[in-house]
């Protein structure tokens, strides 16, 4: 195997002049003199240090957004501030005997740009930095520099921006002619200007008093060429420019006092400036439908998603129904059958996450290239306070990729090749799902009603009646958990049978008597209703039984009849006749019960308790 050579790259912020110009450093020269091995002679496993001397800020991408001037920019073309251009202008004026009025706003200034670049290493001579533009829009700034139309504007924040021209000469003229010295430097420059004006007046008087020969028309004296006066910058003003001080503007803009200077490479927009913008909170953000106030990141995401869906519909309308989209092969593949026209938009940055925010300045309305001209005009009229501009490539979101992901089917949703086992499994799942639903429903019903206890065996009623007739102990029930009905329903408070066992079963009586159904023996009706007042309601009392007062009367009457029976044999015979009749009736009832089928009664505690709770 070939030997692998490791590399170690070190990035340093500052670089000396030698390596930047491509010259060998003294360390490298000393190493070559000592005879160190060349890179091809490095042994296996050793590391070779390769220094890369570049500034870290140069590696960062440029996220600034440019707002183009639709009215068109102005280019001077030639350096009118150079000494040669000024001399030619003065010679032309003297040749045609023309003396222009002094215009302080349009001065011909000779500025040494090489000296400016040495004094300010990161200066951008084609760009002017302006601050104090709090209530100004992009169009307001373009109209402010209408004498020197700029190419575009780079917004930094609500109060400052960079105005960019296509050449350095126009930017220099705009800075010098549209601004003045600071207030501190004006006092210093006054004395120098007075001395200069006095010297100029003396020279003019000397020229008028001289009796030299007149020159022919179109000729210029060689001696006067050396006496041409150039409107050079004063020493104070030149020092102020070299320090790159803020110069106050000559005129106000919408009541704002502007200050300007040459821009540098450090004048860049900070991340999140659009989110902190008070201008958007007051006047609305055009990139989000003119919404005013604080816009949350979730609201921005929803706005982006709605806009993407709208763009997808527009793209499909451009593509046509007959042109089909190819299959989605890869997530990061390019668009297919979609116009390669970028949709200008800004990126969003999460405050807690490391996503890019709508960082670029949104003071203008973003245009859609698919819009018709008839639709663009009312949009521009309604939102004319911010002019539209094109953004840089680094500031645009990858909308083409998002359109591709939305308009084409996802690989998860696409049909795949399946086997018979997969079909069987899907059928089993479809069968199991309703079974699970049924089991869940039955479990819920059981929880509501309660689990059903195992069925219990009950004794036959006929056997119970036989045992009662023979005065024998009744057979106990199979389950001890089921109590007697009388025990659950309660015993009559005034029942004559005090010592009746709870386990005994009642003898079946006619259904007309309620007390006989509850286990109370039937009493003689004739003896109970001897009173005429009681006989009126005898039909009801035969069913319900006698009251406690009637019971006391009955007992007294029975005692009285017993004592009377000893005296009167007729009464005794009547009593025996009644007993015989009662036995016969009981036998008849027994025969009737024997002919009836077996009857079983099942009453659970839970059902009775549930019925009581419902009542």
UniProtKB/Swiss-Prot annotation:
Residues 209-230, 341-360 have a biased composition (Acidic residues). InterPro entries: NCBP3 (IPR019416), Nucleotide-bd_a/b_plait_sf (IPR012677). Residues 185-208, 361-383, 506-516, 549-564, 580-593 have a biased composition (Basic and acidic residues). GO terms for cellular component: cytoplasm; nuclear cap binding complex; nuclear speck; nucleus. The modification Phosphothreonine is found at residue 408. It is found in: Nucleus; Cytoplasm. Residues 15-27, 606-615 have a biased composition (Low complexity). One of its GO terms (molecular function) is mRNA binding. Residues 126-187 are annotated as: RNA recognition motif (RRM) domain. Pfam families: NCBP3. The modification Phosphoserine is found at residues 25, 73, 209-210, 410, 563, 615. Component of an alternative cap-binding complex (CBC) composed of NCBP1/CBP80 and NCBP3. Interacts with SRRT, KPNA3, THOC5 and EIF4A3. This is Nuclear cap-binding protein subunit 3. It comes from Mus musculus. The gene is Ncbp3.
